[in-house]
Amino acid sequence: MDHIHLLLSAHGFTRTRLAKSKPIVVHAIAGSGKSTVIRKILSDLPTPKAYTLGKPDPYSLSNPTIKAFAQFKRGTLDILDEYGQLPLTDLDSSFEFIFTDPYQAPTDNLFEPHYTLETTYRFGPNTCNLLNQAFQSNITSLVTKDNISFGSPYLVDPVGTILAFQPDTYLILCLHQASFFKVSDVIGYQWPTVTLYLACKISEIPEEERHLLFIGLTRHTESLLILGPDAFDSSP
């Protein structure tokens, strides 16, 4: 158990003032390396088993992996990633460490954290500026460059992987026979270039849907194109 706390500190996680309790709660921003830390725990220690409500690791014969939550069986030291996708009342008491990005989860699903990290390796400063303005966050990046652009869905063609946010955008993309993912289905995924379709301005998205907006805004590593009805007024 002490080794896990040392690993969290070594990877830049900040210990809060919250007294240790079960489970140990770790909140980390998208692209901060929390999955990397979990895999390091699995490789260093024989006991822990890790599960996720996001994207599981591919099967491996040689390395321990983060498994899908559907495969969960109680063990000696259980770890859960993306716990924020689960109502707190459904969280099994056997989990010793639980991780999530708090901005990607409904606020009712969150505990107070013992550790936090708001530095990302995924996207760059332009995305951080947009997120910090929209979510009153304090996210920083170790990536030096990225690109964000806005456009009209009627004038600009999508590029890269297409993500859709809100039912109105699902309908439009289906009518055009475009291949896309719903934002709610891409937790744990990333692509170099992403186009995000919005049905309204970022500032008009209701509070109960803002965690989904955050997911949509953080799937890219290089470039994000935001297409909405108010092409140049979609920023916060």
UniProtKB/Swiss-Prot annotation:
Give the classification, highest ranks. Answer: Viruses, Riboviria, Orthornavirae, Kitrinoviricota, Alsuviricetes
The record lists the organism as: White clover mosaic virus (strain M) (WCMV)
Domain ((+)RNA virus helicase ATP-binding) spans 1-117
- Please list the GO biological process terms of this entry: symbiont-mediated suppression of host innate immune response; transport of virus in host, cell to cell
Q: Which GO terms describe its cellular component?
A: host cell cytoplasm
Q: Which UniProt keywords apply?
A: Host cytoplasm, Host-virus interaction, Inhibition of host innate immune response by virus, RNA-binding, Suppressor of RNA silencing, Transport, Viral immunoevasion, Viral movement protein
Q: Which InterPro entries match?
A: (+)RNA_virus_helicase_core_dom, P-loop_NTPase
Q: What is this protein called?
A: Movement and silencing protein TGBp1
The job of this chain, per UniProt, is described as: Transports viral genome to neighboring plant cells directly through plasmosdesmata, without any budding. The movement protein allows efficient cell to cell propagation, by bypassing the host cell wall barrier. Increases plasmodesma size exclusion limit. Acts as a suppressor of RNA-mediated gene silencing, also known as post-transcriptional gene silencing (PTGS), a mechanism of plant viral defense that limits the accumulation of viral RNAs.
Family membership: Belongs to the Tymovirales TGBp1 protein family.
Q: Which residues form the (+)RNA virus helicase C-terminal domain?
A: 118-236
Which GO MF term does the entry hold, naming one?
A: RNA binding
Subcellular location(s) of the protein: Host cytoplasm
Further comment found in the protein's record? TGBp1, TGBp2 and TGBp3 seem to act together for cell-to-cell propagation. TGBp1 is the main movement protein that physically cross the plasmodesma with the viral genome. TGBp2 and TGBp3 would facilitate TGBp1 function.
Tell me which Pfam families the record gives. Answer: Viral_helicase1
Q: Which domain of life is it from?
A: Viruses
